Every structure is written in structure tokens, then in C-alpha cells.
Amino acid sequence: MTQLKNDTFLRALLKEPVEYTPIWMMRQAGRYLPEYRATRARAGSFMGLCTSPDYATEVTLQPLDRFPLDAAILFSDILTVPDAMGLGLYFAEGEGPKFQRPLRDEAAIRALAPADMGKLQYVFDAVASIRKALDGRVPLIGFSGSPFTLACYMVEGGGSDDFRHVKAMLYSRPELLHHILEANTQSVIAYLNAQIDAGAQAVQIFDTWGGALSHAAYREFSLAYMQRIVAGLKREADGRRVPVIVFTKGGGQWLEDIAAIGADCVGLDWTTDIGQARARVGAKVALQGNFDPNALFAEPAAIEREVERILQSYGQGSGHVFNLGHGISQFADPAHAGALVEAVHRLSRDYHGAA
């Protein structure tokens, strides 16, 4: 494989010395970019983009051609995994992802088996294609949803604002939810390992809905399964470590628990103070975050002030990957995203000694 020209992101994840704080943005390839919208129109649909390695490569590289980001992230969707489990993913215009066959009855749940990786070959082909196209420019991140977050969509049949179906199952028939989570966990381990085999140089587990759980339920139904995934992942490829990032949106109160599951880095949303997070778990893990994505609607001068505040809060030294606290808004101005990247690179050098 081609030698990495910029490995700052990987070094920061392992808390090795760096010259500046690296940055990438969740959902950095997305609707806020006019070039993405043009490619999406050519592809004909969102799944048309995801299932074509050529299109997926094109849109993955678009933000890197526009901004000097320190990592690329595979363009895909977390719901490709339950789709490969036979739930029938489709995207309703203006409504987001839906499943034709949500898991509501016991027979369907008992019949659920781990995803057939053969049905996800298009993802692994995309990883290989992107890695080749990057030619060592920056590392490539692979990703998956967490077992619980996937289960939310699988049981609800799509997005939800109250998770009443999955929560009803959790409290009244927990053994059924555990069956789904078991199938999801086996699927995610195989899925992420296949991405690593195809060329992913780091992986992130997106636990988008873990923060909707009670303290006890989070540990039993989300964290325990993510711990099993981390333990089951290949941690070395091309002679170097493949770091693992775990991100629970709304998980700031559980940082110590999350940091204990064996991941290299914990992602933070914008509601957690990164300096306090470092004091709590910084000896054990790197931290990723945690700029409020809606602060990108402010003027560049305000964006720069917020960058400085976050860098100052984290303090001196490595172990920080700058990111948004969640995905970038489709309504964000690309110029403001550019201002964010520029400010992080320029201002963060004061927080790192000679590397």
C-alpha cells in the first residue's frame, strides 16, 4: 500500500506527538456541498450513490478537494447492514430512511440472522476504490452504526422522536431486543473487519441513539455490545495500528464507562466540556470533537473564537482530533466549513511542541 503522506490523524488517535490538531467533519461529504448534490443527481438516488464504488469514491474525495482535511471517511450509510439482513431499506423523499419489514413480531425477530457480507461487497469495493484514489493523501475511516442504534431503526421502521416501539421491547421483552443486538453485533464485527481488510485505516462506531437510554439500559443494551465489537476487531493492518473511535451522542455522563471498553478514542458531542472530559478520561483515550455543528451558521470570526475556546479547553499536547459534535447541516455554508478547517490548523499549532 502507498505510504501515507499525512498521518497526523492516526498519530493523534494514538496520542503520539503531532504538529497541529487534525480535523475531519462528520458527514463531510454531503448535501451542503454543491458538487455532492450534482453527483447525487447523476446517481439518481441516495442508494445509487452508496452502492456504486465509483460514485462513493467521487463523493468521498469531494470535501478533500475543497478543504485540507486530515482524514477521509467512507461515503455510505449505517443502514446498509440491516438492509443486508433483509429488512428492505428505502428512502422516502423528505422522510429519510425507512424499512419495508420492521422487526415487530417475535417470529421475524427469532428468524433474524447476521448480515450476509456478500450483500455488502459494494461497500468493501468502495473502500478499496477510495483507498486507491487517495494514494496516501490522508487516512481513510471506515464506520458502522452501533448495534443499539441499528436496532432503533430496525424496530421503529425508520427514524423516531420517541423510540416507543424499541423502548417497549426493551422493557417488556428484553430477550427479543438482545436477540436483535446479538445479530447486529456479529454483523458489525464482520462488517468493520471487512472494511479494514479492504483498506480502512481507522474505524468509528456511531452510537447515535445511545444517549436516549437510561443509565442502566445504556450499559446493558448499548455499551456491552460495543465492547464486544471493539474486542472482535482487527487492530493492525499494513504494519500499523487501526484505531477505533466510539461515539455515543449524548453520552457525556458515561465517559468513564465508554473509555473502559478498549477503544482508542471517544467521540464527544458539543454538550460536554472537552477539558473536563480530558481530565476524566484523557489518560486512557484520545478525544474527538466537539464543535457545535450549528455554530457553522455564525460568521467566520465567531467560528474562530469557538475553535480557540475548544482548543484552549483541551489544552497542550496530542490526543485531540477536532471534529463537529455531530454531522454537518445540509444548510451549512461550505465557506464557513473552510473557515473552521483553516482556524483549527492555524490556531492549534500553539498547543503542540515541535513534533
Curated annotation (Swiss-Prot):
Localisation per UniProt entry: Cytoplasm
SUPFAM superfamilies for the chain: UROD/MetE-like
One Gene Ontology biological process: protoporphyrinogen IX biosynthetic process from glutamate
Enzyme Commission identifier(s): 4.1.1.37
Site (Transition state stabilizer): 77
Catalysed conversion reaction: uroporphyrinogen III + 4 H(+) = coproporphyrinogen III + 4 CO2
Pfam families: URO-D (PF01208)
Main location class: cytoplasm
CDD domains, per the entry: URO-D
PROSITE patterns: UROD_1, UROD_2
GO molecular function, one term: uroporphyrinogen decarboxylase activity
InterPro entries according to UniProt: UROD/MetE-like_sf (IPR038071), Uroporphyrinogen_deCO2ase_HemE (IPR006361), Uroporphyrinogen_deCOase (IPR000257)
GO cellular component: cytosol
Chain sites annotated for binding substrate: 27-31, 46, 77, 153, 208, 326
Broad class of enzyme this protein falls into: lyase
Keyword field: Cytoplasm, Decarboxylase, Lyase, Porphyrin biosynthesis
Pathway(s) where this gene product acts: Porphyrin-containing compound metabolism; protoporphyrin-IX biosynthesis; coproporphyrinogen-III from 5-aminolevulinate: step 4/4
Superkingdom of this protein's organism: Bacteria
Family of the protein in this entry: Belongs to the uroporphyrinogen decarboxylase family.
Function comment: Catalyzes the decarboxylation of four acetate groups of uroporphyrinogen-III to yield coproporphyrinogen-III.
Quaternary structure (record): Homodimer.
Protein name: Uroporphyrinogen decarboxylase
